[in-house]
Amino acid sequence: MKRAPTKQPAKPAARGGERAQGRVIAAHGRHYIVAPADGGPMLQCFPRRKKSEVAVGDRVAYERTSADQGVIVEIGERRNLLYRSDQFKSKLFAANLDQLLIVLATEPYFSEDLLGRALIAAEANELKPIVVLNKIDVEAALPVARERLAPYRALGYDVLELSVKSAPDDARTQLAPRLAGHSTILLGQSGMGKSTLVNLLVPNAEAATREISAALNSGRHTTTFTRLYPLQDGGALIDSPGFQEFGLYHLTEGRLERAFPEFRPLLAHCRFYNCHHLHEPGCAILEALADGRIAPTRHALYAQLVHEASQIVR
């Protein structure tokens, strides 16, 4: 008679003072929720230093201080870090990403400036950008939205048209294969249908959010903190609060010029190796702008971003 396999005892959770590994799955201010790597219950953690540099998606080492709390003592090596910045401060979005999914809608009217900046941030961090145009069932507003997005399609950006509320199955069919196995951050202005999209892709999202809110000891509204949801087909979806500004003051001029895909083939053809692509003679970018190969709105965005970057003392 074959003996039943011996059941292995569960690995004990880290005790006070012991270092353990985990992944940051939610953040609000200096409060973080860490999912232990050993599969134990999540716990609320705080950074050891006064200035926090922890982001959702970080692999961290922590020391438990009580049954459900700990201190983050080390951040693991990152593949990338997505954040926005102005002259005075920066706001971390998430770390260790593969893709950036930008949610737009036929209505309310979306900001093309924010779209352009999000795409630049994706390019600068070597993330695959995916643009979603939601609410295509609002037929009166659809032609204008398509016209505004046509230049981005021409640049090769993936633009998906869907209606999360009226055609959820189609939306899921389009998105699920693109998200499976990847770490994807969801960005968008308020009112674009981002929360509805999360609930479609993550069936237990509302319950998970309530659990995280309880762990943060808060009754905060569900969109006020960044959180990570594991996906059924592998990978993760990171939902970030809606925002109205996307400063990229931290990007150097060199990173900016390479973040415009239409600029890249031309960079080696400028007369001067340190060309700023603003008013220099023999600039291949300005020549392409003059003959219509580069859209005026895109070059204007580049000029604005260069100006913003120049305000930072490096």
Curated annotation (Swiss-Prot):
Cofactor names: Zn(2+)
Gene Ontology terms: cellular component: cytoplasm
Entry's EC annotation: 3.6.1.-
Gene Ontology BP annotations: ribosomal small subunit biogenesis
Signal peptide, first to last residue: none
Residue ranges of every copy of the CP-type G domain listed in the record: 85-246
Family as reported in the entry's similarity comment: Belongs to the TRAFAC class YlqF/YawG GTPase family. RsgA subfamily.
Name of the protein: Small ribosomal subunit biogenesis GTPase RsgA
